[in-house]
Amino acid sequence: MGVTVVSHPLVQHKLTIMRKKETSTASFRRLLKEISLLLCYEVTRNLELTTMSIETPLMPMEAPVLEGKKLVFASILRAGNGLLEGMLDLVPAARVAHIGLYRDHDTLQPIEYYFKAPEDIVNRLVIVVDPMLATANSAIAAIDKLKERGATNIRFLCLLAAPEGIERFTKAHPDVEVFTASIDECLDEKGYIVPGLGDAGDRMYGTK
């Protein structure tokens, strides 16, 4: 399906501020919510529409509305929730899935500790959100789980991606399109994206 880099000037400006090491936790969290609105706009750009009959104060008309079942936003905990908040402001009727994964710092492999999703995700568009696509291990594991539950129409949304992560992800799930604000240089020896912005979860919650 490929990779879409969202190059909108507002996205890039806000991302630069988020990258700065002196940006405060409060500012980082606010910027993440703001940028999630802009990214959500892009990832939902080609949703299908139908029409319904309504009445304006002046006359009846056929007006466009979203077709099909409501979206599912699937957040990879915990950092994914930073993107989720803004996206729910934009699409408040969306269903939500939570996927609890943490990365073993020695093996860099994901360990699942929580999974909760709507039962009827088979015919829904599922947008998986996680700020970072680094090794891609967590993203691949999350989408493996969603596909086990029957999801077939999936997109992945992140702030930053590493070339190594994109390569692994697209090999594992070639049917899932990736949306990101930036493809950075590479991964370092600890599996962090560089130049990156640090650990998104730690910067969002003020933890180490």
Swiss-Prot record:
Quote the record's binding site residues for uracil. I193, G198, D199, A200
Q: Which Pfam families match?
A: UPRTase
One GO biological process term: UMP salvage
Q: Does the keyword Lipid biosynthesis apply?
A: no
Entry cofactor note text? Binds 1 Mg(2+) ion per subunit. The magnesium is bound as Mg-PRPP.
First-tier enzyme category under EC: transferase
Q: Catalytic activity annotated for this protein?
A: UMP + diphosphate = 5-phospho-alpha-D-ribose 1-diphosphate + uracil
| Residues noted as binding 5-phospho-alpha-D-ribose 1-diphosphate in the record, renumbered to the chain | R78, R103, D130, P131, M132, L133, A134, T135, A136, N137, S138, D199
Q: What is its EC number?
A: 2.4.2.9
Could you list this entry's UniProt keywords, alphabetically sorted: Allosteric enzyme, Glycosyltransferase, GTP-binding, Magnesium, Nucleotide-binding, Transferase
Q: Which cofactor does it need?
A: Mg(2+)
Report activity regulation: Allosterically activated by GTP.
Which positions carry the signal peptide feature in this UniProt record? none
Q: Write down the InterPro entries for this protein, in alphabetical order.
A: PRibTrfase_dom, PRTase-like, Upp_B, UPRTase/APRTase, Ura_phspho_trans
Q: What pathway does this protein act in?
A: Pyrimidine metabolism; UMP biosynthesis via salvage pathway; UMP from uracil: step 1/1
User: What are the GO MF terms of this UniProt record?
Assistant: GTP binding; magnesium ion binding; uracil phosphoribosyltransferase activity
* Family from the record: Belongs to the UPRTase family.
Write out the function statement from the record.
Catalyzes the conversion of uracil and 5-phospho-alpha-D-ribose 1-diphosphate (PRPP) to UMP and diphosphate.
What name does the UniProt record give this protein?
Uracil phosphoribosyltransferase
Per the UniProt record, the source organism is Brucella melitensis biotype 2 (strain ATCC 23457)
Q: Which gene encodes it?
A: upp
